[in-house]
Swiss-Prot record:
SUPFAM superfamilies: Prim-pol domain (SSF56747). GO terms for molecular function: DNA-directed RNA polymerase activity; metal ion binding. Its cofactor is Mg(2+); Mn(2+). The active site is at D98, D100, D295. The gene is priS. Pfam families: DNA_primase_S. This is DNA primase small subunit PriS. Catalytic subunit of DNA primase, an RNA polymerase that catalyzes the synthesis of short RNA molecules used as primers for DNA polymerase during DNA replication. The small subunit contains the primase catalytic core and has DNA synthesis activity on its own. Binding to the large subunit stabilizes and modulates the activity, increasing the rate of DNA synthesis while decreasing the length of the DNA fragments, and conferring RNA synthesis capability. The DNA polymerase activity may enable DNA primase to also catalyze primer extension after primer synthesis. May also play a role in DNA repair. The keyword Transferase applies. It is an enzyme of class 2 (transferase). GO terms for cellular component: DNA-directed RNA polymerase complex; primosome complex. Belongs to the eukaryotic-type primase small subunit family.
């Protein structure tokens, strides 16, 4: 990044911060703070181990220092400005989740556009919220667009604030479906008669109420619905695509599903041994489709620094923005986080990496060279290293 570009961005970030209202997190004075300034050279240098007392009022600090990135800790401490973690005196930590489009299995880097990556990340966010709200029963959630390629979720429920790393890793494993075994999801009870199996009879069911068991049940029923809507030959052919399912088992599983649909709806998967085997195989699809691929180190690290909502992301010029739960569906990460400071006027930039830019409801295909663009587009390009500031 050239000095002209760096000075321009730093100045405009400062203009934004002098007008912005930034709300600090709860217990802000108990947290460590860090920031990355606009420094020369290709790398970035983190300034950390600061307390709010060191920084002063957060809005004054932002307007004065005009930082490139701003962070606060998930952890709360006795001495947040101590230079070593052992001297800080850990009290508790928020449970923080990070979804980054770069790490999603569904994202094809180099092929998916920025908009497509963010759309896939929003789908993953919905799955994460399903786990947090329905499975864990958390309602004190703060949802944040990171300003870059993903989302953060902060849980500040008193019940989890004192969890240590191993317990937090169990939460990670649960939402990612790591180590999930089908037999753990199945309720088994002895019943009179054969229950579709040879005696002694055991009735094995998937819960329809919640958790991974209910997800497995919903997916199983969706597959059954698709199979029953097909021509029989097509359904049998599809069933035989699963490992271990030959023609005989495919026929038996399909007939059992057709004859016992109401039992399947109720969760009974013991309608036939072949169908039980199919249900077990489908678990792999359930985990792939329904897990939340969060960044594990962020959640397990009780000392993690995370972006400050209301600050600007120095790699995009977009605002790190809180999202009300009820507004999530309507939230557009390419429109809503565009700062008002950068709207309404054009600037000149020297584009070095042309291509598509989708921002603030518009789409631009830019070639390399001098270009006059809306300022929010120019800031985005410069922050991402795709342009330098041109002469006006």
């Amino acid at each position: 990044m050239e000095e002209r570009t760096r000075a321009y961005l730093r100045g405009r970030f400062g203009d934004h911060y002098r007008q912005a209202s930034v709300t600090p997190p709860p217990a802000a004075n108990e947290r460590e703070w860090g920031f990355i300034p606009w420094t020369e050279g290709p790398g970035e240098t983190m300034v950390r181990h600061r307390s709010l007392l060191d920084l002063g009022e957060i809005e004054d600090f932002l307007g004065r220092r005009k930082p490139r990135h701003v962070y606060f800790s998930a952890g709360r401490y006795d001495e947040p400005s101590a230079s070593t973690m052992s001297d800080k005196g850990w009290r508790s930590s928020d449970l923080v989740f990070d979804l980054d489009a770069d790490h999603l299995p569904s994202v094809v880097l180099g092929e998916d556009s920025y908009a497509e990556m963010l759309a896939k990340c929003k789908d993953a966010l919905r799955r994460l919220l399903d786990f947090l709200e329905d499975d864990f029963g958390f309602d004190d959630l703060t949802i944040v667009f990171s300003g870059g390629r993903g989302y953060h979720v902060h849980v500040r429920d008193e019940r989890i604030r004192h969890l240590e790393r191993d317990a937090r890793r169990e939460v990670v494993d649960y939402v990612r479906g790591i180590g999930l075994e089908f037999d753990e999801l199945v309720d088994e009870e002895s019943v009179a008669g054969t229950a579709g199996r040879s005696s002694p009879a055991q009735k094995r069911t998937l819960s329809t109420e919640g958790g991974w068991s209910a997800r497995a049940h919903r997916h199983m029923l969706a597959v059954v619905d698709d199979l029953l809507a097909m021509e029989e030959a097509d359904a049998l052919e599809q069933l035989q695509e699963y490992d271990g399912i030959g023609e005989g088992k495919a026929t038996a599983a399909l007939n059992a599903a057709r004859s016992n649909y109401e039992q399947l709806e109720a969760g009974n998967i013991d309608v036939h041994p072949a169908f039980y085997q199919l249900a077990k195989i489908l678990l792999h699809e359930v985990v792939a489709a329904d897990n939340a691929p969060i960044d594990e180190p962020v959640t397990t690290d009780t000392n993690r620094l995370i972006r400050l909502p209301g600050s600007l992301h120095g790699g995009s010029g977009l605002e790190v923005q809180r999202i009300d739960r009820d507004d999530l569906d309507a939230f557009d990460p390419l429109v809503d986080p565009v700062p008002e400071t950068f709207r309404g006027h054009d600037i000149t930039v020297e584009v070095t990496d042309g291509g598509l830019v989708e921002l603030d409801g518009d789409s631009f295909t830019l070639e390399a060279g001098n270009q006059t663009v809306p300022e929010h587009v120019g800031v985005f390009l410069m922050a991402r290293g795709r342009a330098e500031k041109g002469k006006e």
